[in-house]
Amino acid sequence: MGMVNEITNKLIDIKGRIAFEHKDYIIYIDNSRKKEVDSGDIQIFKDRKQVYDFSIAYPSKECKSKGIYNNTKDKFINNIDLEKLHEIIMTTGL
């Protein structure tokens, strides 16, 4: 859970929606619904094609757990995708 914690801790304070370029990727983060459901979304594009579509569960008063769900594969993130997402997110200037 170390990488999941690092990613969620880096993204939890983002308000609303942001989009930016980083390396060869366009990254779109949407935390606009975080107050309602304690979750956000990350979409990552490369060469105008969506390569990742994740949902993030942030901790709340009712539920302290965190998680990253791969919407494309309809299951929680696997280690390969987690390592790639970690590499992308942790090297941004957020």
Could you describe each region identified by the protein language model?
Residues E36-P59:
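A short, structured beta-strand/loop element
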Residues E21-K23, D30-S32, F45, A57-P59, ...:
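A structural detector for beta-sheet-dominated domains
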Residues Y25-D30, Q43, Q50-V51, F76, ...:
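A general secondary-structure boundary signal
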Residues R17, K46-Q50, K84-L85:
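Gram-negative host-targeted secretion-system effectors, predominantly Type III and Type IV
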